[in-house]
From Swiss-Prot:
Region (Disordered): 222-264
Gene3D superfamilies: Ribonuclease H-like superfamily/Ribonuclease H
Pfam families tied to this protein: RNase_HII
Organism: Mycobacterium tuberculosis (strain ATCC 25618 / H37Rv)
Miscellaneous section: Was identified as a high-confidence drug target.
Cofactor detail note: Manganese or magnesium. Binds 1 divalent metal ion per monomer in the absence of substrate. May bind a second metal ion after substrate binding.
Residue ranges annotated for the RNase H type-2 domain, each copy included: 33-224
Family: Belongs to the RNase HII family.
InterPro entries xrefs: RNase_HII, RNase_HII/HIII, RNase_HII/HIII_dom, RNaseH-like_sf, RNaseH_sf
Name of the protein in its database record: Ribonuclease HII
Keyword field contains Transmembrane: no
GO cellular component, one term: cytoplasm
Organism phylogeny: Bacteria, Bacillati, Actinomycetota, Actinomycetes, Mycobacteriales
Length: 264
């Protein structure tokens, strides 16, 4: 029997972990496993890396992550508790860090898609199917499906979102020590009023994305009250993508970015 795309009923959202298990279980029953979820964090930030994670959860391991949910709905404390559990129970996971300079050169959206491809390619276990959070990911060597609100609909995407969020937050805390005064540990590089004031006062640092309008205005000396917009320049984002990675030698905040659960 030829493996093919799942029927539309597979991607219907149901509440809670039960709904997350339903989606992946259907794919496994159809012979399409292992199923990988992929998600990103940091698209809208005007400073810091774009972080993309891919995660494979075996069908028998999702129950061990009862607290799993969309990372945006979880408190920082809950995410930190889930992070080591996901690393422990995941069949495989991989986290990719794309630095600000790379985002500027490639563009936010295209860098994000390339990051998703690289995250999937870095998995220690080759998935039979990939679920992405909202974005179609062309160029994957296996079938894939974008799921709107995927981090609340599929456990593997939710797990990837937690891995990406915690990884990025830890990097931003370390960058706060490297670049004092911007408040990276608090706002994580997003365009809050406090960040905008610090940016206007100190000017951009190497971690800022010059493709974002507010950063470009400050850098050019034309800072205005609109500096808090924090949106990428629409003229950017059409070039090819690439990927940069943090390593232990290049940054103290970097953690083990690739994993495979023991005994798998």
């Amino acid at each position: 029997m030829t493996k093919t795309w799942p029927p539309r009923t597979v991607i219907r959202k149901s509440g809670g972990l039960r709904g997350m298990r339903t989606l992946e279980s259907a794919l496994h029953r159809g012979g399409l496993g292992p199923v990988a979820g992929v998600d990103e964090v940091g698209r809208g930030a005007c400073a810091g890396p774009l972080v993309v994670a891919a995660c494979v959860l075996g069908p028998g391991r999702i129950a061990s992550l009862a607290a799993l949910d969309d990372s945006k709905k979880l408190s920082e404390q809950a995410r930190e508790k889930l992070f080591p559990l996901i690393c422990r129970y995941a069949v495989a996971y991989h986290v990719v860090f794309i630095p600000s300079a790379e985002v500027d050169r490639r563009g936010v959206h295209v860098a994000n898609i390339e990051g998703m491809r690289r995250a999937v390619a870095g998995l220690a276990v080759r998935p039979g199917y990939v679920l992405s959070d909202g974005f179609r990911v062309p160029g994957l060597p296996m079938p894939s499906l974008p799921v709107i609100g995927g981090d609340a609909a599929a456990a593997c995407i939710a797990a990837a979102s937690v891995l990406a969020k915690v990884s990025r937050d830890r990097v931003m805390v370390a960058l706060d020590a490297d670049h004092p005064g911007y408040g990276f540990a608090e706002h994580k590089g997003y365009s809050t009023p406090a960040h905008s004031r610090a940016l206007a006062r100190l000017g951009p640092c190497p971690q800022h994305r010059y493709s974002f309008i507010n950063v470009r205005r400050v850098a050019s000396g034309s800072n205005t009250a609109e500096v808090a917009d924090g949106q990428p320049d629409p003229r950017d984002g059409t070039a090819q993508t690439g990927e940069g990675r943090w390593s232990k030698s290049s940054h103290p905040a970097t953690m083990r970015a690739t994993g495979r659960a023991q005994g798998t």
